């Protein structure tokens, strides 16, 4: 895997605080408007080609607390596909570890609240098949993969 230099400060404490605050605001607006505002990601590659966004309710692996996180998604038949890119940061996002520990989750889509799903990590073959579609949806995923040494996981959310 080829690694290029990520932006300076990507993994800084300040960046993490900004992301946390922005995510909290995103969740609040999405819930308030039932996804009519917040269901499209318009940052980075999403500025010119907005990417669909859902809210992911997942259970903390240590706390048991329910967390809600905005995540970009791709529809693949009855499944939803999400990417644990964390913007190319060195570590996987917390929601990924939570889904591995507690795969049952709930997603909220524009105009739809409370779809029950079960998460699983895509197999290597599934990831190879899905990655071009994911990059077509949000081109920055390819760039994020070059910023980190970790293999960015792809997660499939299946209906339950």
Residue locations for each model-derived region?
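Short beta-strand segments
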Residues: 51-87
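Long, non-globular segments of proteins
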Residues: 2-25, 157-159
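Short, structured beta-strand-loop surface elements
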Residues: 5-9, 86-141, 147-151, 159-160
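Short secondary-structure boundary/capping segments
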Residues: 45-46, 72, 97
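Short, conserved active-site entrance elements at the starts or edges of catalytic domains
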Residues: 16-61
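Short hydrophobic/aromatic beta-strand or adjacent loop that forms the aromatic wall/cage
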Residues: 53, 152-154
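Hydrophobic side chains in beta-strands
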Residues: 58, 75, 109, 157-159
């Amino acid at each position: 895997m080829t690694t290029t230099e990520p932006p300076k400060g990507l993994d800084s404490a300040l960046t993490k605080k900004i992301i946390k605050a922005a995510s909290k605001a995103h969740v609040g607006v999405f819930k308030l408007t039932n996804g009519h505002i917040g269901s499209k990601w318009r940052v980075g590659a999403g500025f010119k080609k907005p990417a669909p966004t859902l809210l992911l309710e997942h259970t903390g692996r240590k706390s048991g607390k329910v967390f809600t996180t905005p995540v970009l998604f791709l529809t693949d038949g009855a499944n939803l596909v999400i990417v644990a890119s964390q913007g190319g940061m060195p570590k996987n996002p917390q929601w990924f570890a939570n889904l591995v520990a507690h795969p049952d989750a709930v997603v909220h889509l524009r105009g739809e609240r409370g779809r029950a799903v079960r998460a699983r990590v895509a197999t290597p073959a599934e990831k190879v098949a899905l990655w071009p579609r994911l990059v077509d949806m949000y081109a920055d995923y390819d760039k994020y993969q070059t910023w980190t040494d970790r293999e960015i996981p792809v997660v499939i959310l299946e209906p339950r």
